[in-house]
Each structure stands twice: as structure tokens, then as C-alpha cells.
Amino acid sequence: MKKELFQYCDSVLHIRKSRRVRTFEKLLDNYWAFREKNHGTLLFITSDIEETYSTIHKAIVTYMDCMDIMNIRKIPNEIFIDCLIGNQEKILIIIKKDYNLEEVKGMRVDQVFIDCIGDSDININSDIIIHYLLPLTVNNNGKYLDNIILIY
């Protein structure tokens, strides 16, 4: 299933489970370095929302000296993390379960991360990427940022 998605993603990262936190830290750091506005939104699609949340939270708290978590909101199938970089730059990180992805239509995000954890199969196909996820990144916040990144 994951290999079918390769051709629809700008970047594909194959990582060991032990390197997840450092990889997520590097992804957040790259976004921070290459964005063009002082605000932005990142969307993580995953089959295991708690595992992805735990990884992102640990990456921010442990390694991101310049980023602070201001607010965390949890609702069924979604987690919102409001972050502050420096004094005034705001980033919203949305972690969404791979269920009912038609709901994202109309959102605007800078990058979409498809997080395939371990051996779990994610409920995403080429139609969802083309019709729902790719249009979200139309107003991408930086010409050097990839639109869709697959992490497995």
C-alpha cells in the first residue's frame, strides 16, 4: 500500500522507529527555516493519532529550543497543537486520523505529512492525495518546501 503512494508524494522518508523523534524534529526545523511567512499550518495524517502526537510533542519539548507549545486541543480523530516560535511567529500543527479525509476540503496548509507508523496500513489512496490533500497546499508557505511528505 505505501509503495503505491510514492509517486504522489514530493518526498518519501523511510526511517527506523528509534529515529522518529529526531526525524520529526528535523522536519519541523526545515519547515521553520524555509517558510516565507511568520505563520503557518502543518497537517499530519496518521493511522495512530496518539503515537504521532507523542512523537511530535517529544520532538518539540526535547529538541526545539526556539519553539514553545502554547495550547493543545484534542477532539475525536484530531489533535491541534498551537506553537509559538520566538516572540510572534505562530504555527498550527494538526494531527488527523486517516478516517473521513473528505473533511479537510477547503483547509489551507503549508505541508502535509502522511505518517505510516511501522507495519500499520494507512487508509489513503491516490484519489485522496490528488483530490483532497494536494489542493490543500496550493498556497504553500515557501517555494523550497515539499507539499506532501510520506514517512514510513
Cite the ranges covered by each PLM segment.
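Phosphate/NTP-binding elements of NTP-utilizing enzymes
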Residues: 1-152
